[in-house]
């Protein structure tokens, strides 16, 4: 039996985040398919402060052993943002080193790194989720065992730091969620390990009752849906501006679900529902006229795939290569570059039920073909076994 150590900054059923959810989905499915999986993570639940939330020690979730280690220091996001703004400004003199920036980024857990360094011979291979954090950068540095990395990378300042060369070039294989992500990383680094377009899996729920969400949240009018973190940097300002104009001509709502980290305009038709159950989320996607993903930087956008899985078309930011890849390969939505184009794309979908239904169906076919969990785990399992057998 192949013994796998998974390294990720946060982990748990109630932890919200793309890389974190990916790590849990893959860990549980690898464990269920015959691998022996142990997760090394921190006690943090909140990625803003890295505040210790869970108890240190060992627990088990759906058969996967979880070992949590305390975070040494909480993060002050205001200080971090100020320092980062200066650090990544090419016109400024660097007041800190790249290593010091990684420490500020966190979550710093020296006990986690030390434990893996001391106990790594108990494992055949390590899997790291996301390139960006202390837990990946520092642990890879001390690791002698085989490793693979899910970078979940997109174009952003930290990926251009010199120390990222070792992070991307040391692993024996890199697994990518999209072709755009793989191309980005290949263009930036001289990759020695294997590069594999693994994608990720989506739970395709059929026979979803689209009225369930409406009943629970009192939604009467047709609605557009945004699901994800509601924060600056996600392109929501363009969506809000466009919706004001859309609302003037159409009795339609804009429903927002997810964690609110920025102010939401007080405008007719904008409805914030917070976190919802998985059943309500599927129902919302099923019942929406369309979903909208306005973010300019995504490494996958699971919500786009969830929308397709409910046969609902998606409007996406054309500046994001990953989102454009989904649209080009599937035909399940339309792009926009600004608020005027968003309005135009929405009108194209809204005024033609036939076109909307067709986009929904071919979006579903795309997800079913490329993002079934059985196929994803097969694509991941084969190289993991081969690397483990070759290196040990």
Which functions belong to the PLM regions below?
Residues 329-340, 348-353:
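Conserved acidic donor-binding segment of nucleotide-sugar-dependent glycosyltransferases
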Residues 313-317:
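Short hydrophobic beta-strand element within catalytic cores of glycosyltransferases
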Residues 265, 319-330, 335:
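Short acidic/histidine- and often glycine-rich active-site loop of Leloir-type glycosyltransferases
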Residues 326, 348, 355-369, 376-382:
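A short, well-ordered alpha-helix in the C-terminal region of glycosyltransferases
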Residues 216-234, 240-244:
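Conserved donor-binding/catalytic core segment of Leloir-type glycosyltransferases
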Residues 258-283, 287-290:
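Nucleotide-activated donor-binding/catalytic signature segment of Leloir-type glycosyltransferases, i.e.
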Residues 296:
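Aromatic "clamp/platform" in nucleotide-sugar-dependent glycosyltransferases that forms part
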Residues 146-157, 164-209, 219, 226:
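Donor nucleotide-sugar binding/catalytic pocket of nucleotide-sugar-dependent glycosyltransferases
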